[in-house]
Amino acid sequence: MRTLANLIDHLGADFDFTVITRDHDLGEEEPFFDGVGAEGGGAGRAVGKARVWYLPARRLTMGNLRGLLRSLPHDLLYLNSFFSVPFAIKLLLLRRLGAIPKVPVILAPRGEFSAGALAISPVKKICYLAAVKMSGMCRDITWQASSHFEEQDIRRIFGDRASVVVAPDLPAVARPNVGAPRRLEKMPGELRVLFLSRISPMKNLDGLLLMLNGMTEPIQLHIYGPVEDLAYWEKCRTIIQELPSNVMVEYQGAVAHGVVAQIFAEHDLFFFPTHGENFGHVILESLTAGCPVLISDQTPWSALEENGAGWAFPLNRPEFFQQALRECVALGAAEYRDFRKRAQGFARLALQDEHTLQANQGMFALALQRGR
């Protein structure tokens, strides 16, 4: 996950990170490697500034996780989700039962408590939240909120006494000597639109397609990302088949992160009407590549229009999104070059925010202090 990779890149000189994760990507069955530290006695694999243990599904049992956590010395447990069964629910339960070391815990819910996220499979989530509250599993943990909005979401569920630290997600570390991606010129009367994300209800691809259904201008949409929910993807495909002839749609599948910047550069607009993002690294990646964005107002990126980098609109106003699309279609090459420069300038401001790094460092220090 990009968020965790960026965190380790920034803080890897201050902390020794050991990562436990699945041995395959979302929607894939082939493992990254064979038997890397998953069985007894292994030392994991060195990846950047961390050691990573890649576990196959058969090793994500309570017993194996217990053995692994007891064998790996650690001073703090960082959980990158609240609703993940193997990497949150099982670990919190093991800790509550005293089966693994009771070290301090930081839990980053990654937007899982937003109204949009909780509305997906709500019964299961409500039942689990009730069980967690009754058990006291989260009573002594430190919560990471990526924004003040997420802090409110956490406190709405766990109360004002919950220990919540606002530490925004860290951007990618700047890489030296990276060449600028090749760009395609924007001509008036055309628009190359990109959707790049996991294909799931939370990301709202169906909402995007329905907005395009009301357009009369020529638009080309490329969809990139792994299919997380097959039934949802079939729903999207049905909408695609009903789109007017002026809207051309192609699904390009999942994509390696190393070519993402080039993909953004080949498009005129990143269209991402998500139901909620606690940060939205993909939005920053788009801006960094000089691709303006058209997104929902359910992310921290609220100052796009005032910085000339794009738009953020409420999802209940589809006509706002459609008007922005029409404005983009009408723009010519020179106007769009300026648009791209403003997007990159806004990205540079976000990347230079030292407060974000200090907030993350302080969060770890506070959690460790609470555990003494």
Predicted regions and their residues:
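N-terminal subdomain of nucleotide-sugar transferases
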Residues: 1-36, 372
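Glycosyltransferase donor-sugar binding loop
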Residues: 21-26, 196, 220-237, 253
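Aromatic "clamp/platform" in nucleotide-sugar-dependent glycosyltransferases that forms part
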Residues: 275
